[in-house]
Amino acid sequence: MNEPKKTERPLLLGLLVKKFKAEGTPYIHFNWGRISLVLVVLIAFAWISMATLLFAYFKYVKDFDKVKFSNMMLLPIKYSEHKIEMGDRHIERGLQAVDNNNFNDGIRLLRLGLIRSPGNLEGLVKLAQLYEFGLKRKDIAIEMYIDGFGHDGINNKEFCIAALRTMLRNKMDTEIITIANEYLPKEFKKGDNPNLQTIAYAAATSSFYRGNFDKTEDYIHAFLLNESVDGIILSAKVSWDRGNKFSAIKKLESSLYKFPNSDELYSQLCYFYRKIDDFDSARRYAQLRNIKSPSNPNPIIDLIYLYNKYGIEDEVIKYSKQIIKNFSDNEIAIFQLANFAASTGKINIAQFCYELALEKDYDLGNFALTLVEAHISTKDYDGAVTFSEELLLENPKWLQDQWPIFSSLRALASYGLNRPDLGEIYLEEFLSEPRITSETLVAVADRFTANQMYQQAQKILDFAYTNDTNNQRILNNLIKVNLELGMTQDLGDQIKKLLQTRRPDKELLRDAYNRLGSDLFIFTKNRNAILMELGAILRD
């Protein structure tokens, strides 16, 4: 009797099939078609699952709100593109946060974005500005700008301007020249990348500040900088500093035919004529500047300073009234007039500006302080103290923010009234303020110097120099004060450092040379060597 025929039996959902040979022996057959299909389905499921996890990870953990699921599906082959896209989105959100005054979140997002997209120069510029002006870390800002040139910064106008302005402002002349040597071609013609001219102008300016006039003129001619107002003015400054004052003025005057509406040319001509004490020419160009730009208060402010210098009081009053009449709604213009009054002791003008600020709801703190300073400038220390006490009684909201400057003015007035005990208290109060900037310290020291209070000025400048040893203005003023006081302890080292800075002030060098030769400074460190070096510089 024959056994019934054994049939196939599917196993594992049909992935395997149990079959039988002719003699009835079973064996396993792999259903490769179905296995392949299942593997494909599993791989697809795993791929989609992983893409889903990555999507959630980047969206919710890495804060990438515009992540695309399609990019997650192809992440292994699109990772570089995804990384840059993610960085750009963080930078976009960071810029929005900064615009909304959310600086902490903005800085965080910008930093995250630049890690992933270092070539996003808009984000780099914004973050560098926050470091320089907000966090007072100009060293980090400069390093970022230098790195930015390696990310095609040479082809980005906004980046080049921001980077080179910051480096010029912070006297990074060596770094600017290095960038120029790396990126500037040997020849330049019209139609070439205009950013090359921006770099050339920065390099020419750095060379000028370092006293390398030949190199400055090489940049000006090679990169056609003398076809722009900035280049013409720089060329004129080179001629002026070489002693060719007539040539410098001629360069500017001849350029007025090409640039008849250039406010910068008129302003520079007015400055040059003031320096050579040609009042009529200085006044003419200041008035022409005013005619060319009637809506600009700056030419009128220049005229006010000019007439004040030559003691023409009627014209000072006339143009001051013109500012008040035509620009009373312009807070900056009124504050410029208040600053003039503060520096020249025009108490009536300062008082009027203060009252106008009250009426117009301007930033009252600045105007109040200029009125205090106006009293001090004319040595009306009683008036300064009286007005200060009135402010203390009123205790306005702005006073807390302006307290350091307010304390410095009270110190000045107290010393002026021969109350050094109070003066010392207020001065220490001023110096103990942690937020105070180098610029503020220098400005306050200048006020003490102007009132012949050299010991107090020296104390402020010494404090400022300790915290900002590379600030040339602080160093200049500290040397001047030490020369006045006959302070020899650190004077030698300070003068040596001054000689290594940008275009040291020739008048200061001459004063130092004359004074160091006297017996009062016989114990100055390296005195003879410094005198020889100063003598050589002054003979050139």
Residue ranges of model-derived segments:
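Long, contiguous interaction/recruitment modules in multidomain scaffold/adaptor proteins
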Residues: N2-K83, G191-N195, T205, Y209-L224, ...
